[in-house]
Every structure is written in C-alpha cells, then in structure tokens.
C-alpha cells in the first residue's frame, strides 16, 4: 500500500536527534553502534509530561547521575546545536521552571545489548496535544510492532484520572496493534512519598493498574532516580527482551557450580543493568544487585572523568571475596566466593577461561546447547 503524504511527513518528523554515547564509551563502541544485522526490539516509553521518563532514560542509558538531570534539557539542546541538526525537528527537550524535563513529540534512540540485540527506544513526549495525536493520526506508527510498553506514572500527579485515561488508551492501541507486547508500569518519584506510606501507596496503585490493564497483564515497579529501584525495574524489563536468556542462565549456573561460587552476576557493559544471575543460597539484602549496579556505574563515571577506564576490581574480607571483571565484549561479571581455600588467582583464571563460551552464547543466532559442562 502506498503511504500518504501525511504518513511520510510524520515518519520524517519523528527522526530524533542523535544520542550521545555514554561517557567513557567511544562513539561506535559495542554499547552504542548500530549493527548491520540486528534483532531490533521496539520499546515505548510513555507517560504524562514531567513524569520523569527522560531523566530515568538518561540515567540508565547515558550515564547521567541523578543530580545532573535537572539541567538535562539545556544539555540536549546544546548537543542538538553542536551537531547542527535542523532546528525544525519536532523532537527536543526543555526544562520548565521547577526543573522538570519535557520531551516534545517522539525521540528515538538505539541501544545495543548483547551482540545483535538492539533496543529501539521511543521516548514519547507527554503533553496533552501529543498524547492525543498518538491515539489518532500516529496510532499505527507508534503502537505497531511493540515488544515492550513502559508507562511512567508520577506518584504525586494531581491529574491521576487523566493519567489513567491515557494509560488505558495506550492499552487499547497496544491490544489492537501489538497484542503480544509486555506491559510495565513504573510508579515513579517514590522518594517524594513519606517512607512509612510508600508500601501502602504503591500497593494501592499497583492494584488499580492491574485491574485497569485487563485483559493484558502488567508488571509494576516503584522507582526513584535517587536509589537502586530504577535499576531494579529496568533490569527486569531488559531481562524480558533477551532472546536466549534461559541458555544464558543455565550456563551461568554451570559456571558457578564448577568454580564453587556463592553467586555469579552478569551486568550489561554500558548500562550495568543486571541481565542474569545465579546464587546457591539466599542472601539477606534482596536489592543488593541493583545497589551494586548503581555504585559501580557511578565509579565508572568517576574513572571516565579522570581519563581512566574501569576494568576490574576485587573486594576481600574475612567472610568473602568478590571479583568484578570484564567478561565478554558486552558484559561484566561479578563472582562472589566464600571458600577461603580458593586463591584469587584461580578464580580470575576461571573467569578468563569462561569468556569464549559466553561470547558464543551472546549471539542471538548462537548455539542452543549448554556450552559449559563438567
């Protein structure tokens, strides 16, 4: 079918400004380059204006720290002008009088994960005019071939009824155009809620969202840019998009058992999101993975500012030893050992020897059999 002029115009206007590679990651690196033959996964990031979508995306994918998101809009405009991108483009961001970043229309970015997997991220501006256009003139373009819908709710929104209305409109469009899409709801800015009220408020909001989402299923997360909850949510989202995650987990378990590790974690290299893990016994802190992601990512950023690159580290005390090291071209690995009889050198050699196996497994079209055997 031949496209109409209006459809062609919409497609042209929806081409957003180039996304800068993360600090410390050269342009064209594995974390950001567009591959020739990639498995693309379309991810919609939606929510009302000022809900925090662009800030969280910049923290996860562009190595911003929370306090720097207040000047995010001005930074993006500076980058647009420095790249000499046509100022008539409909995609840009501004910061309002209270520091909220507002995205206009749809900003596209491509983020490469684990070899051939590419996240085609659509950050959709949340102004009322644009939201209405998404459900009318741009409906098919926006909601076709979606793998994941992420809808962000400001927990302190004064227009909750309107938020829910737009969310339900998104679900109707998803049901029509991408019925197999996975739905995630992020109840954001939870740091603004009194600590003793957070569990109750989130539980009530989660129940409402699950009810409104039927017949679709939604997964809900409480999030804040000021703690590890943001990493918890996005790690869970990315986990759903990895095509061979079961093979990855099976090999990770075999690796952990062979080297007698208490825990093994895989982090995506650019974002430091947890993409897979294995543990042989329960741990007290259920949020330790996301805390580590947050800490190490900020440490990597500090290294970059000093013109140094983070490669590996070892932490040891009387109870355990933890190793974080480059694993494959797209991942870091963390290995936790509690057996004092196993020397550090042996663990590091085991990590090095396992790299080639996990490099093969990362390929989307790679082998399906278990690569690590006793």
Swiss-Prot record:
Activity regulation info: The activation of GTP-binding proteins is generally mediated by a guanine exchange factor (GEF), while inactivation through hydrolysis of bound GTP is catalyzed by a GTPase activating protein (GAP). The Ragulator complex functions as a GEF and promotes the active GTP-bound form. The GATOR1 complex functions as a GAP and stimulates RRAGB GTPase activity to turn it into its inactive GDP-bound form, preventing mTORC1 recruitment and activation.
Modified residues (N-acetylmethionine): 1
GO term, biological process aspect, one: negative regulation of autophagy
Single GO molecular function: GTPase activity
Organism: Rattus norvegicus (Rat)
Residue ranges with Basic and acidic residues bias: 1-15
Pfam families named among the record's database cross-references: Gtr1_RagA
Identification of the protein by name: Ras-related GTP-binding protein B
């Amino acid at each position: 079918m031949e496209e109409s002029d209006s459809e062609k115009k919409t497609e042209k206007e929806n081409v957003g400004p180039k996304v800068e590679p993360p600090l410390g990651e050269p342009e064209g690196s594995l974390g950001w380059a567009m591959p020739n033959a990639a498995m693309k996964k379309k991810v919609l990031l939606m929510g009302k204006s000022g809900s925090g979508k662009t800030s969280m995306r910049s923290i996860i994918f562009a190595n911003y720290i929370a306090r720097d998101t207040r000047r995010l809009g001005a930074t993006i405009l500076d980058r647009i002008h420095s790249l000499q991108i046509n100022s008539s483009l409909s995609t840009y961001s501004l910061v309002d009088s209270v520091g909220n970043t507002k995205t206009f229309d749809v900003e596209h970015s491509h983020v490469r994960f684990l070899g051939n997997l590419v996240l085609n991220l659509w950050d959709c501006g949340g102004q009322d005019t644009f939201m209405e256009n998404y459900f009318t003139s741009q409906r098919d373009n926006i909601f076709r071939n979606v793998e994941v819908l992420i809808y962000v709710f400001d927990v302190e929104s004064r227009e909750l009824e309107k938020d829910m209305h737009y969310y339900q409109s998104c679900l109707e469009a998803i049901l029509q155009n991408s019925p197999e899409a996975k739905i995630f709801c992020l109840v954001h800015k939870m740091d603004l809620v009194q600590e003793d009220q957070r569990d109750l408020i989130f539980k009530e909001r989660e129940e409402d969202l699950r009810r409104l989402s039927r017949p679709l299923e939604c997964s809900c997360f409480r999030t804040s840019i000021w703690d590890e909850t943001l990493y918890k949510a996005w790690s869970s989202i990315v986990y759903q998009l990895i095509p061979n995650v079961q093979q990855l987990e099976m090999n990770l378990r075999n690796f952990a058992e062979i080297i007698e590790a208490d825990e093994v974690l895989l982090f995506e290299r650019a974002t430091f999101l947890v993409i897979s893990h294995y543990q042989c016994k329960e741990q007290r802190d259920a949020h330790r993975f996301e805390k580590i992601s947050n800490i190490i990512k900020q440490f990597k950023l500090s290294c970059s500012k000093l013109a140094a690159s983070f490669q590996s580290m070892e932490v040891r005390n009387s109870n355990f030893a933890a190793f974080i090291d480059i694993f494959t071209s797209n991942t870091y690995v963390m290995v936790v050992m509690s057996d004092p009889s196993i020397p550090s050198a042996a663990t590091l050699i085991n990590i090095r020897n396992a790299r080639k196996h996990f490099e093969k497994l990362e390929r989307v079209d790679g082998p399906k059999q278990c690569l690590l055997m006793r």
